[in-house]
């Protein structure tokens, strides 16, 4: 699949249900095309009507072209259908995105069209991967009506060409709540640009996280609110009217609901504040009044409330820190970490208050605070070959240990060690792993004989933060999947990582989206790279480690390191 297509393949079918509510179209019926479904601020495109005397192949081509209508509307496409087919065609259930149209096959009155470089999304807009060869062939039945060919049977899908998506859809996030209610969790989608953007975001948010995410995330929005009654943006205020019942919502749930809306709607640059009503009645939120700012809810930040972008490293076995700017010195941290302890692979929590490191023989873990009175202790873990640890915002320290049977996944919470079985990860040859700060995503690199794989699993927890189970690991697509040898991985956002591989004297960086939609963001460095240092915090630079240098592959920024420095990392 071409990477340009892959970038936008998570586009949502949310608009389709709105687009479907248009006048029925028959062969000679006059349609009202002056009330488009989405007022997009782009050059309008009004596809032409079926040409008199058009062949079956030309009718199918016109039908597919009509789905490029701008502003978005399915009314144009329905003109190519018979009256009955136009009434029954239900494209909202599936969205197909294709790179190019392949060959036509015609055996009157049927036309088959092959979609090349195609992928699909389900009715919720969830990326489901590429289409199998058999699924990429669309069959259309045609009949003559009043002497003209019209489509009598068409696939129930919105079939969209990739360039149209590149212009009209933007990657966005919906924000839900992890089970403890302390942190928001972003779920990536693509939403149509333009005046309907806020409505689409709220509609998507109200659709909920889905049954497959039960135990991973939840929503604090009121039950019964499957669709917004209305979303109107006036003078920077988004007036959101929902259906539903708030009688079971205490102060904490109301705050979470406001945070979900604020974080989701702040992506719309036209929205500054939100005014919420339920069935037309104003909702007064504790501490906010009858409206609240889109910058509200900072306490639920997926990256943590005290997240910094300082760098940490080991220097002679002692922990040091620096802002990472040119000329800024590396200084020892406070407490016992300022002394040498013969450790490797250090990890600092998101608050910058506690660190953990693997012992030099990789069988144990040292943990301790970074305050002046910080003391070091040993985590309740005895391993064989422990990998670099990872923290989440709850204070869980995640570990992977490897022995002859493969990988074991566990976390340390206080004085407890808890094992977590992750199908597709446990027992495999894990070489690198990451856990998202919100504690809902586990990413691993699994080494193979000819190539490595990158997989992601979602972690399920109780309301008290106990991890219960994990979903089966899902393979994440990569353009070099057949030959990829991953040197390292790191966060670039709460929903994306970067994977680096060394190809000769060139380091190749590939962004990987954790929703499974491939990404086209790809860049290189003409250096030998041994690791990558990244953070989900937007203001953090991405660094590659090369000798005694940190190299920014995006800005070509070069930070020289002291020769006795190792294990450079961000916190979190």
Model feature map: region roles:
Residues 6-8, 13, 17-572:
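Bimodal "functional hotspot" detector
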């Amino acid at each position: 699949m071409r990477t340009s297509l892959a970038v936008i393949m998570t586009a949502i079918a949310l608009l389709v249900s709105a687009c479907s509510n248009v006048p029925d179209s028959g062969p000679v019926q006059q349609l009202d095309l002056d009330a488009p479904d989405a007022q997009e601020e782009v050059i309008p495109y009004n596809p032409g009507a079926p040409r008199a005397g058009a062949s079956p192949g030309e009718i199918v081509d016109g039908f597919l072209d009509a789905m490029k209508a701008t502003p978005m509307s399915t009314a144009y496409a329905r003109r190519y259908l018979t009256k009955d087919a136009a009434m029954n065609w239900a494209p909202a259930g599936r969205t197909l995105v294709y790179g190019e149209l392949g060959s036509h096959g015609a055996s009157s009155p049927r036309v088959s069209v092959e979609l090349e470089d195609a992928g699909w999304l389900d009715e919720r807009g969830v990326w489901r991967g590429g289409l199998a060869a058999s699924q990429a062939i669309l069959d259309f039945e045609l009949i003559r009506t009043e002497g003209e060919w019209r489509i009598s049977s068409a696939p129930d899908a919105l079939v969209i060409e990739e360039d149209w998506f590149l212009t009209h859809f933007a990657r966005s996030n919906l924000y839900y709540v992890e089970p403890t209610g302390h942190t928001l969790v972003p779920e990536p989608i693509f939403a149509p640009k333009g005046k309907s953007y806020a409505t689409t975001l709220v509609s998507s948010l109200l659709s909920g996280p889905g049954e497959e995410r039960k135990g991973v995330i939840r929503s604090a929005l009121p039950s019964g609110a499957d669709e917004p009654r209305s979303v109107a943006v006036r003078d920077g205020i988004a007036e959101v009217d929902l259906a539903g019942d708030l009688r079971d919502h205490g102060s904490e749930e109301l705050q979470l609901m406001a945070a979900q809306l604020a974080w989701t709607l702040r992506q719309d640059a036209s929205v500054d504040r939100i005014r919420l009503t339920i069935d037309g009645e104003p909702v007064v939120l504790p501490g906010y009044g009858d409206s609240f700012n889109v910058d509200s809810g900072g306490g639920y930040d997926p990256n943590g409330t005290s997240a910094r972008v300082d760098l940490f490293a080991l220097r002679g076995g002692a922990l040091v820190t620096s802002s990472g700017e040119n000329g800024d010195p590396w200084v020892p941290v406070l407490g016992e970490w300022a002394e040498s302890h013969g450790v490797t692979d250090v990890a600092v929590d998101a608050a910058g208050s506690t660190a953990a490191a693997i012992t030099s023989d990789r069988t144990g873990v040292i943990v301790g605070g970074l305050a002046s009175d910080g003391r070091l202790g040993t985590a309740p873990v005895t391993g064989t070959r422990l990998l670099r640890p990872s923290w989440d915002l709850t204070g869980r320290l995640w570990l992977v240990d490897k022995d002859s049977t493969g990988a074991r996944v566990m976390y340390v919470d206080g004085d407890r060690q808890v094992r977590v079985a992750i199908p597709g990860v446990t027992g495999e040859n894990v070489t690198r792993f990451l856990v998202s700060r919100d504690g809902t995503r586990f990413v691993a690199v699994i080494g193979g004989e000819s190539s490595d794989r990158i997989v992601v699993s979602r972690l399920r927890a109780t309301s008290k933060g106990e991890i219960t189970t994990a979903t089966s690991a899902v393979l994440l697509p990569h353009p070099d999947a057949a030959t990829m040898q991953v040197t390292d991985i790191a966060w670039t956002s709460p929903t994306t990582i970067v994977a680096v591989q060394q190809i000769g004297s060139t380091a190749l960086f590939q962004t990987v989206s954790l929703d499974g939609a491939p990404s086209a963001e790809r860049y290189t460095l003409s250096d030998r790279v041994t690791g990558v240092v990244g953070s989900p915090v937007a203001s953090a630079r991405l660094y590659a480690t090369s000798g005694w240098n940190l190299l920014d592959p995006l800005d070509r920024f070069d930070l020289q390191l002291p020769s006795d420095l190792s294990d450079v990392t961000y916190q979190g």
